[in-house]
């Protein structure tokens, strides 16, 4: 195969990897945890993955503790948990 063909194949495989969603079997278990505001009162917007809705949803986070299903951005949540 020519170097141009190899580069095209590599580019297509990279694109496929980026665009393929996380499958439920590859999704971290913490993505199944419910949203947890935590005990603090430094309220800020955060995102959690909702297995029932199959999407990342914004919620109010207290700023400490909570659980691992807590992301600063919707993009971070989707790249980690969304299927």
From Swiss-Prot:
Any GO MF annotation of the entry: serine-type endopeptidase inhibitor activity
Q: What Pfam families does UniProt report for this protein, alphabetically?
A: Kunitz_BPTI (PF00014)
Spell out the GO cellular component terms annotated for this protein, sorted alphabetically and separated by semicolons.
extracellular region
Keyword Signal set for record: yes
Q: What range does the record give for the signal peptide?
A: 1-24
Its main localization is secreted
CDD domains from the UniProt entry: Kunitz_textilinin-like
- BPTI/Kunitz inhibitor domain boundaries: 31-81
InterPro entries in the cross-refs: Kunitz_BPTI, Kunitz_BPTI_sf, Prtase_inh_Kunz-CS, TFPI/VKTCI-like
Where does the record say this protein resides?
Secreted
Disulfide bonding pattern of the chain: 31-81, 40-64, 56-77
- Keyword Secreted listed: yes
Q: Which keywords appear in this protein's UniProt record, sorted alphabetically?
A: Disulfide bond, Protease inhibitor, Secreted, Serine protease inhibitor, Signal
Protein origin, superkingdom: Eukaryota
Q: In which tissues is it expressed?
A: Expressed by the venom gland.
* Known function: Serine protease inhibitor. Does not inhibit plasmin, and does not reduce blood loss in the mouse tail vein blood loss model.
PANTHER family associated with the record:
KUNITZ-TYPE PROTEASE INHIBITOR-RELATED
The similarity comment for this entry is:
Belongs to the venom Kunitz-type family.
What is the name of this protein?
Kunitz-type serine protease inhibitor textilinin-6
Organism in which the protein naturally occurs = Pseudonaja textilis textilis
């Amino acid at each position: 195969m020519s170097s141009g063909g190899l580069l095209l194949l590599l580019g297509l495989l990279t694109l496929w990897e980026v665009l393929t969603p996380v499958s439920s079997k590859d999704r971290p278990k913490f993505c199944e945890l419910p949203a947890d505001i935590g005990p603090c009162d430094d309220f800020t917007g955060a995102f959690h993955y909702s297995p029932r809705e199959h999407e990342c949803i914004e919620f109010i986070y207290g700023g400490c503790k909570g659980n691992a299903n807590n992301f600063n951005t919707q993009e971070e949540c989707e790249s980690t948990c969304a299927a």
